[in-house]
A protein has these predicted regions:
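Signal peptide processing junction and immediate N-terminal pro/mature segment
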Residues: 19-36
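Membrane-embedded helix-loop-helix hairpins and adjacent transmembrane boundary segments
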Residues: 428-924
């Protein structure tokens, strides 16, 4: 039986390894036929090349070390604008094919300003010892070098190379727990990760991370599952939720017990769960052949892609590492059966292949000459751009100034390349005259609407409350459009695309909150006939409380204006290429003109028009995405279900993430705050003719929030399934995840239709901004100006209100310009965080005023300030989810207010100012 197995092994080996000319990749076959390898490789287009990204290559000065060759497996990275390359190895004397000796180096080379055409390499220092095959990561201080080998033993040393006057300084960092070489590593999310490799020739499955720059020792992570991986490629990239460590490819060496193999899959380590999981097999979309990433290098691109450069051909490499084992097996079989001619023939063939392996020209080895791209959210692989400059293994890859710099590596086994190549991938945005026509027509129409209502205005009451002429259904749509904003239109689809539907129950809480708002809050605003919501706080508590609350509201509204100005500008920049700052300025100016002219009546009717555009655009997008997914409706449902995109609830009791309990508590609190203390919303309650109409408008908004919002989450799931089945249609350089929906509009929809959906984003923005500006003008005019000048006429108040519109809009625009420089992964999360931080205390004041008659002005202010302080402390000192900030602030304000009500006792006539008093009055 044993002999039969040996013969079977020989037959398989012969089939895999027969004929040195038989193992030739498709590209090499074409190049052999054409007689020009470089041109053949460079000219062949890739089926997956997309229409949105361009790839350009440029050569930097060549780097030769120890002779005429470059080096393989060096440490490389950036320090103060200079490219540093340290260590590495090559064969400076006799070629490897002739038995030459591999030499390891300790020299450090520097290329100042790699983007300049005039820079040249210079020797800048030396490593503590000669090393190669380690890990290098760039940090703000310089280049961190980890592990490696000197050719005799593995190293556990970790040190930082810093550029300074006089040369390169080497600073020791915490050493690895074990010596490692041929591993992979990356930095991201505050950690340096290392995994795989070997220790003095023995394969390792160990994984470690170092909290940089604070930790004094490495943390042991769970071992990588499956076999060990030598020479894998690694990167840290966001998966839509958190930064994860991706470990791709690599190989398991052959030994006496089993053949070696090159991995065609990858692993991902999630720091939140502290578990490894597998990613999709490395099969580029549209192909059927698995690839490996042995000897490849990796860097992140945009917010969710990883770019891989170089690496060996799986079949050729796997045959090479198994050939010695096949020879040994054949020799053993021949010892037992010396006269077996078949075995002799197989052995001779194997030995010839082994002898000839290092002698072939570089194209024969079929090193990967394409950019291999992985998308973390859809878990898909594509290839983009083919160039012979990419066909290297063991090269270093360094990111700098929007370019990826490939340094050295080997062009074939034993032969090092001195080439240094910069790769730049860019996005080709184009808006088109048809889209511009639709967008400009919409903007002009909104300005004309504002002008029309300006002509109808009679006094300040018309400007602030529309004279009570607004129908209930228009007020309801206006509330919905105001609270919707571009945040919902872009960020909710982006959130569902990257994660799932767990945020949807938060929108259901809007309907749940509508019932207590109608019963307990609305009567006060309507029956007291207030213009500003904060007038109630003065009547209930004191003037100080009113002024503080109004001032805080104004601050929050200006911050919100900035955010919702930034969002559509970000979208327009991503799809048209127009400068982000110009977009912000243009959007702000158009919105200021529109809402300043028409007052609240123009705002409300503008919201109605914009709401129709918003909803219509969303419903159309859902249909297009679902039917555009391969398999249509069934494909959409199947792919979305398999990926968990329709998950509604996370039942875990984790206060740090968006679990069901966090969503419900946070949603109830945040929406209660918005619908009971936000002048923008309350002002809509006051524009209707009576309290009954106001109740109907609130309920309509709640129902629209529940049912129409399904479309936004369906868009997110549809974006996932569409790009899952069309991964080459993505923009590989997309920097902000929130631009995925507008990118889809511009990349997939025809001219004009795309402009209409982009106009819907502007509609969402303008409805919110105009409402915010009008409400700020109302609060400032009524709560401050009228207080300082109680004898001011209606005309004077109207002038102040209009000037306030202009000034507040300009301030919001300025903050939006500043916000454009911030790193905000999810604008939805950022907005909810700001909402909780700035407005939770306001909701607490109204809650205390209406339901707790014993709480007076001093106690209420104490509770209010305590709530704000506690929320800031929770944010900075705990990992609590931002969704709970509003709930924490609300509860803290009320509890502290109750406690201090026993200290600050106040007597005041509360008739008509508390719920119990109002209920008693109604009963009479």
């Amino acid at each position: 039986m044993k002999n039969i197995l040996k013969y079977l092994f020989l037959i398989v080996a012969a089939a895999c390894l027969s004929g040195s000319s038989g193992t030739i990749c498709a590209a090499n076959q074409q190049s052999s036929a054409s007689g020009n390898t470089t041109e053949a490789l460079a000219s062949k287009p890739l089926a997956n090349d997309n229409a949105f990204n361009t790839v350009a290559y440029r050569s930097l000065p060549a780097l030769t070390v120890g002779g005429k060759e470059g080096v393989s497996a060096p440490f490389a990275g950036m320090s103060k604008g200079s490219l540093l390359v340290a260590g590495g190895c090559n064969f400076p004397g006799k070629p490897a094919a002739e038995g030459g000796e591999k030499v390891f180096y300790r020299d450090i080379y520097e290329l100042e300003n790699p983007t300049s055409d005039k820079s040249n390499w210079k020797k800048a220092g030396q490593l503590p010892e000669a090393l190669a095959y380690g890990v290098a990561v760039t940090v703000p201080e310089g280049l961190v070098c980890i592990g490696g080998t000197n050719g005799k033993e593995s190293s556990a040393k970790v040190f930082l190379l810093k550029k300074q006057k006089g040369g390169i300084k080497c600073v020791n960092l915490p050493a690895l727990p074990q010596a490692l070489d041929n591993m992979a590593g990356a930095i991201g999310g505050g950690y340096i990760y290392v995994a795989g490799g070997q220790t003095n020739g023995r394969s390792s499955r160990a994984a470690y991370r170092l909290s940089y720059p604070h930790a004094t020792s490495w943390e042991r992570l769970p071992d990588i599952p499956g076999a060990a991986r030598l020479q894998p490629a690694a990167a840290v990239q966001n998966n839509g939720v958190t930064n994860c460590f991706y470990l791709m490819g690599g190989f398991q060496p052959a030994d006496a017990s089993h053949p070696g193999f090159a991995n065609t899959d990858g692993l991902v380590f999630n720091p939140q769960t502290k578990q490894w999981s597998r990613v999709a097999e490395i099969i580029p979309h549209g192909t059927k052949t698995p690839m490996t990433l042995v000897g490849a290098a990796a860097l992140t691109s945009g917010c969710a892609h990883i770019i891989f450069v170089g690496g060996v051909n799986r079949d050729i490499f796997q045959q090479a590492i198994n050939r010695p084992l096949a020879i040994a097996q054949a020799e053993n079989a021949l010892l037992q059966h010396p006269d077996d001619s078949a075995t002799k023939g197989q052995l001779e063939t194997l030995r010839n292949q082994q002898a000839e392996y290092m002698l072939h020209p570089a194209p024969w080895y079929c090193f990967n000459d394409e950019l291999l791209i992985y998308h973390t959210i859809t878990d898909t692989w594509v290839t983009e751009s083919r160039s012979p400059l990419l066909a290297r293994a063991g090269a270093a890859l360094v990111g700098h100034d929007g370019e990826w710099i490939v340094v050295g590596g080997e062009s074939k086994p034993g032969v090092r390349s001195a080439d240094v190549t910069a790769i730049k991938m860019t996005m080709r945005p184009s808006f088109g005259w048809g889209n511009w026509t639709v967008l400009i027509a919409y903007l002009v129409a909104m300005i004309l609407l504002g002008y029309y209502f300006m002509k109808r205005e009679g006094d300040a009451d018309d400007f602030f409350k529309g004279g009570g002429r607004i129908p209930w259904w228009a007020a309801g749509i206006s509330i919905y459009a105001t609270m919707l904003s571009a945040i919902t239109y872009m960020a909710y689809p982006a959130k569902a695309y990257a994660t799932d539907w767990t945020y949807y129950p938060m929108l259901v809480t809007i309907l749940l909150v509508s019932f207590p708002v109608i019963k307990y809050y609305l009567p006060f605003f309507r029956r007291l006939n207030v213009t500003s919501a904060y007038e109630y706080l003065e009547r209930r508590f004191n003037a100080t409380t009113r002024l503080i609350a109004s001032a805080l509201f104004i601050i929050f509204m200006v911050a919100r204006m900035a955010l919702v100005l930034y969002l559509p500008s970000l979208a327009l920049t991503a799809v048209t290429g127009i400068d982000l700052y110009i977009c912000i300025i243009l959007m702000a100016l158009v919105t200021i003109v529109y809402c300043t002219m028409g007052g609240v009546e123009a705002v409300v009717w503008g919201d109605v028009v914009q709401g129709i555009i918003l909803v219509g655009g969303a419903l159309f997008a859902v249909g297009y995405l679902v039917f555009g997914t391969e398999g249509g409706v069934s494909g959409f449902l199947q792919l979305g279900s398999d990926a968990g995109k329709f998950r509604l609830f996370d039942w875990s009791f984790d206060y740090r993430s968006a679990t069901f309990w966090v969503i419900i508590l946070g949603g109830m609190a945040n929406n209660l705050i918005s619908y009971t203390s936000d002048q923008t919303v309350i002002q809509r309650y006051l524009t209707t003719k009576d309290e009954r109409s106001a109740r109907q408008s609130i309920m309509l908004n709640g129902l629209m929030s529940v049912f129409i919002s399904i479309a936004f989450f369906a868009i997110g799931a549809g974006l996932y399934t569409f790009f899952k089945t069309h991964p080459a249609e993505l923009d590989y350089t997309m920097l902000k995840g929130d631009t995925i929906f507008p990118f889809f509009m511009m990349s997939q929809l025809p001219q004009g239709l795309a402009g209409l959906l982009i106009a819907a984003i502007f509609a969402a923005t303008m409805s919110t901004i105009s409402s915010n500006i009008n409400s700020v003008a109302t609060a400032l005019s009524v709560d401050f100006y009228k207080r300082w000048r109680p004898q001011a006429s209606s005309e004077q108040t109207l002038k102040v209100a209009r000037r306030t519109c202009i000034v507040s809009g300009a301030i919001g625009m300025g903050i939006a310009l500043l916000m454009a420089t911030w790193e905000i992964l999810s604008l939805l999360d950022f907005f909810q965080e700001i909402l909780g931080l700035l407005s939770s205390g306001l909701g607490g004041l109204f809650l205390m005023g209406i339901f707790f008659p014993r709480i007076g002005g001093k106690a209420a202010l104490t509770g209010f300030l305590s709530g704000v302080c506690v929320v800031f402390l929770v944010k900075n000192l705990t990992p609590t989810s931002f969704l709970l900030y509003g709930f924490i602030g609300l509860v803290t304000s009320v509890l502290v207010g109750l406690i201090f009500s026993y200290i600050f006792k106040e007597e005041k006539n509360l008739k008509g100012l508390c719920w119990k008093q109002l209920d008693a009055d109604n009963a009479k």
